Amino acid sequence: LRGEVRGLPSSFRVVTSRIVNDGIGISAIVINDPEADVLVIEDCTDEYGVCVLIKGATCSMYVVSVYCRFGTALGPYLQYMENVRVKCGNTYMIMGMDANAVSPLWFSKGENLGRGRLNEANGLLLEEWILEGRMIVINEPSEWYTFSGPNGSSDIDVTLVNEAGGRFGYEWSVQPEWGVSDHNLIRIRVSLDGLVADASPSPQSARWQTRDTDWGEYMGDVKAKADVFGLAQYENVSVDEKVDLLTEWIYGANDWNMRRHTAVRTFQNEWWSVELAEKRSELRRRRHAFQRIRNAGAASLADRLQAFRDCKIEYKRMLCEAKLRCWQEFVASESNENPWGRVFKLCRGRRKPVDVCSVKVDGVYTDTWEGSVNAMMNVFFPASIDDASEIDRLKAIARPLPPDLEMDEVSDSVRRCKVRKSPGPDGIVGEMVRAVWGAIPEYMFCLYKQCLLESYFPQKWKIASLVILLKLLDRIRSDPGSYRPICLLDNLGKVLEGIMVKRLDQKLMDVEVSPYQFAFTYGKSTEDAWRCVQRHVECSEMKYVIGLNIDFQGAFDNLGWLSMLLKLDEAQSNEFGLWMSYFGGRKVYYVGKTGIVRKDVTRGCPQGSKSGPAMWKLVMNELLLALVAAGFFIVAFADDGTIVIGANSRSALEELGTRCLQLCHEWGKRVCVPVSAGKTTCILMKGHLSANRPPCIRLNGTSISYKSEVKHLGIFVAERMNFRPHFVYLRGKILGLVGCLRRVMRKSWGLGRRATCILYKGLFVACMSYGASVWFRTLRFSYASILLNRCQRLVLYASLNVCRTVSTERMQVLHGELPWDLEATRRGLLSEFRKGITPVDGDPITDEEMLGLSGSQFKELLMERLLDVWQGRWDVSEKGRLTHEFIPSVRFVRENEWMAFGLCLGYVLTGHGSMNGFLHKRGLSNTPVCMCGAPNEDVKHLLGECPLYEDLRDLNGCGLLIRNGSLDVSGALSEIGAFEKLNQFAVSLFGRRSRLMRGMRIRE
């Protein structure tokens, strides 16, 4: 469906062909063996077929799937298959194809031969290719056709192997009983005689399930094991032996108190039932009954065909209903208990594994799993180009011993260990480290103290497990730059790293540090970096201001160790020897199901380590200070830098920009981090220049690109600091999130109100409000508020049980959450209050009112003022007047959590729904007349007047009154009892109305 294979377990790996012009994927390969490594052959996967290399314990083999479309020429498919055959070479390859061609070579039945059809002509072409390419057909004669549909039967499916596969034995058979598709399933058994399984399978890290662990008992077990060995004896062993002993004690306690984590999890197929099994058997019987007499021309042929089709339709209906019912029960039990759990991850697609693809290196694709991983690792971890003699010189300098380690230092570092995160190679998670520190702090303190005294970082903690993530789904998968490496390090080693980084931060307090690095600094964020740029642009007296967004190529991966050591030496770090040990002998490995690829690391900051950010901040500080000294203004967040340059002429801008980039280039050359001329961009932030002649700023003779719109630190901005592109981007992002969660945010079932509210605030509002303090002032323009509230409408419609035609104003009140323009304003003003920024004219709270307010008082007052603004809008709005009668106060739903309604009550509260009066206005009904004869069927008529529902009506119980001949609904939601009765009345009313309408249509 739309190029995807759906309905399979999440543990299955699916590779599909490229989407063709009509949006249909035509072939796929599904791998259900979790113990196999899969390499997608990118240069042999296109619109004609799919090719993967599967590596198991005994051998590697190419698996190819080809679908030749009916009625099309075979030439392009033969060219594709020839390319695959050449690519596979002498490696075993098996190809399954729907050839839409017949031939005696693959035992097609005789009645389909000699008729001059296109499939026979294609069969002749395929025969020639098979013979020329020395391919082997492993089809065997069968009484069953490979294709058997209502319109005919034929043997059009071919299975081929190359010469390398000819040495194995095959059992090829058609299995008509295994499925109900027109294409019968084909089973192929391969006898791999003579092949021996790998005796040294890939090592797997130990993992334990920490859920429901009794940590008190766990700590007692760790302490008991440590006490058996004794602290005195522990103090006398080497550092590496201490690490091994501590790990052994933790493993013992883990095995006693927890279950080992298994990579393969099996889930019972709960939706399959006896009724489905019986219906499937009936469908097979009817299919065979039809096939037996089809060629005989029996008189009952049409009856049997119709019976087969009816049974097939019924079977599919039962399948869909069973799957949907099971999914609904799963959503109800899982998501309402934990909205961020398995259901959320399934909807977001987070559980789908990403297979390694063949990558292009110097114009040539890799053809093995190990080759692809090695090529990626060579990009992620480039070889060092540092001067070894200079490193030896630094190592030879005599240095004083570091200060004695304090218990508080270790305790603070342990406390900063993150929980519920993936562990390193040793499998020890943050929860375990905290528990071990609570059980045997003296042993851990002894270990880290000796590391500092000996200036030795244990070798075991310098080995990282590599995880390769695809940056974006639309990236070119054959490009190593499309992937992000994450190094998983041992948490015990991260504790020592934390101690080292903390001491380095204290040492840097005596060194000049640029205030314009906003990353890795307490109290600073991306929003602070953006506001700093905004203030500089607004305060600039120059006629023109441009922003240079500097891109450092592989910043963390390429940073030279020598540059870091030199900066540590300049800072006179007392732990220099420990840092030297930390950088030496580092290794990384990538584990597959059947193998492991290792590499020595001689450069860069491990992405995932605690020291990486500190090292980058230390080294980049030199560039920031140099640019400021040269008269430039720069704001940096990690490796993202924006240089703001002002001038009164184009030529001056170009001269300053070129000189600035030259400074960055020279610094990057020294620290082995080149500036990427292709990704560095320029944008005009102030002033007007000709669109046909943007500023020409060069880096080593290459002009950097000028952009009219850029994305920086997650925020889109256009020329002259216009944030309109960001609101357009937000709509697309919110729409994507809503689309993912529509599987569980349904009108008649799905997430409950509690889960919906959690996702609304924790996902949608958080996504919308990112960077709000930067762009919320733009909301004074009507276009910005309109665009932002349109984004909110997408979420509200998915969250509420109302019709699509309900206005945004009504949905905001029914949901009880601030309009997004007010929510963004609230978050922006709160951020400014925390930073001590003075309010401007038009803000809800004046400067005088802010005096003496605490943070909580300001937050409460701000919310009240914004609610008043919202109330004013609701009172004067021309839309939603019926809803205003039910809910005149915007605070009502916020103050009453029980206000959760279904679709029928949504009809009542909004006036939009299954009512002739409403439908007639929109051209969806021929008449506004009610079935009782009243001229206009609307909500008030149904609730208070229509005689068809008199026996269901309880006006007093529902809080409804008849005043002056009209229905007063203001008391309908006055208390939970009236609300529940009104809800029941609405369900009964519209249920009966639906039945009456069906009866009228039948009579007509």
Swiss-Prot record:
It is an enzyme of class 2 (transferase). The keyword Nuclease applies. It holds the Pfam family Exo_endo_phos_2. Residues 853-1004 are annotated as: Nucleic acid-binding endonuclease. SUPFAM superfamilies: DNA/RNA polymerases, DNase I-like. Keywords: Endonuclease, Hydrolase, Nuclease, Nucleotidyltransferase, RNA-directed DNA polymerase, Transferase, Transposable element. Residues 450-717 form the Reverse transcriptase domain. Its EC number is 2.7.7.49. InterPro entries: DNA/RNA_pol_sf (IPR043502), Endo/exonu/phosph_ase_sf (IPR036691), Endo/exonuclease/phosphatase (IPR005135), RT_dom (IPR000477). Disulfide bonds: none annotated. It catalyses: DNA(n) + a 2'-deoxyribonucleoside 5'-triphosphate = DNA(n+1) + diphosphate. GO terms for molecular function: endonuclease activity; RNA-directed DNA polymerase activity. Coiled coil: none annotated. This is Retrovirus-related Pol polyprotein from type-1 retrotransposable element R1. It comes from Bradysia coprophila.
